Amino acid sequence: MGWLHASPPLPKNSTAERLPRCRVLESTHPALKMPHVDGCNDVLSAFNLSGYVMSGGMGATPLTWQEIQSLNESAGLFLGSWSMRQVRSMSESYCRLLNQSSEKDIPPPWVDNYEDYRRYMLQQSERNMLARRINP
């Protein structure tokens, strides 16, 4: 999700608003299909409730153990140690991908069907080439 929430830079002469990748991608983009996860609803709910990261002076940072413990107690989640470790790990991964994925051409970390993704990217590059020929 960090990849989807990252905001790639705009072209230098653009005046458009810089938006997260999830709002810029077409609805048919293969990277928008999230993996199906069974049996971890408590972990996913806790991660969503947490806000994914903490905001610091230098940008997004992973959730601290104190934040996760406070969330567990205040929201009455009753997470065990394994679940809390997963929330922490997800927060670390989210931060890493959020920071690394700010470049435009960074591929998604996961796609459901690689062939669909490859086909989609090929179609996009063909469209871009045609657009450059029409509007040089």
What is the predicted role of each segment?
Residues M1-S74, S81-P136:
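Charged interaction scaffolds used for protein-protein
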